[in-house]
């Protein structure tokens, strides 16, 4: 009898363990934060002054495929700079990424996830000798935390590490690091949960 009662309790609680977002949700994620970009061999070669911290932003359009798997397309934007004044080398990066993540742990109001992805970085380099394009492939891994704020809004904290480099300075033998760490926080909008009144259902469902 006790076993049957416990089973009934677990079945009744199952929808509450869905995590954030829930299965079948479409998602829009807005994130902003700081990039830590090591200057590496390029900075050692040129001796250019370089700050470690720079702003970074992400916009994600995704879909919760099942209770644990979430994927989508992300658009990223970041800034970087080497040197000062008229001779500075300024970098603007626009990234197009395919991303997939899976839940490591989840409850009724949160999801801890790990993910990764691949994409392309469109890098515009501004320098005294003239602007140039130095595009590059990019790959990343991530670890994050999503938590419920309201029925269709959640918070997100994410740390990711990207690998990417580009020949941004023709006068140097080493490439410029376009990757590094990105720590962001923001919000996720999720909609069309199976429990929502407006969610599409099968005929007769």
Task: Please state what every model-predicted region is.
Residues 2-9:
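Sec-dependent signal peptide recognition
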Residues 13-15:
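N-terminal signal peptide c-region/cleavage motif recognized by signal peptidases
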Residues 18-65, 118, 182-205:
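Short glycine/proline- and aromatic-enriched beta-strand/turn motifs that initiate or cap beta-hairpins
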Residues 27, 111-113, 154:
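Structural motif
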Residues 40-45, 83-86, 124-129, 167-171:
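Short acidic, glycine/proline-rich loop/turn micro-motifs
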Residues 41, 48, 74-77, 141, ...:
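Predominantly the C-terminal beta-signal and adjacent terminal strand-loop region
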Residues 60-130, 136-137, 149, 184-191:
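Gram-negative (and chloroplast) outer-membrane scaffold detector with strong preference
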């Amino acid at each position: 009898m006790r076993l049957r009662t416990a089973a009934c309790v677990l079945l009744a609680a199952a929808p509450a363990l869905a995590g954030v977002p829930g299965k079948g949700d479409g998602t829009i994620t807005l994130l902003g934060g700081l990039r830590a970009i090591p200057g590496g061999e390029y900075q050692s070669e040129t001796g250019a002054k370089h700050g470690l911290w720079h702003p970074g932003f992400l916009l994600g359009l995704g879909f919760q495929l099942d209770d644990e798997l979430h994927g989508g397309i992300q658009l990223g934007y970041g800034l970087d700079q080497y040197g000062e004044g008229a001779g500075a080398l300024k970098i603007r990066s626009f990234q197009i990424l395919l991303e997939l993540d899976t839940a490591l742990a989840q409850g009724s109001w949160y999801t801890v996830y790990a993910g990764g992805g691949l994409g392309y970085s469109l890098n515009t380099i501004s320098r005294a000798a003239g602007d140039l394009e130095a595009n590059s492939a990019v790959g990343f891994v991530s670890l994050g935390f999503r938590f419920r704020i309201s029925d269709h809004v959640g918070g997100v904290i994410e740390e990711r590490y990207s690998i990417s480099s580009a020949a941004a300075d023709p006068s140097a033998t080493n490439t410029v690091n376009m990757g590094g760490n990105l720590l962001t926080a923001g919000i996720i909008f999720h909609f069309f949960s199976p429990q929502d009144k407006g969610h599409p259902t099968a005929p007769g469902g």
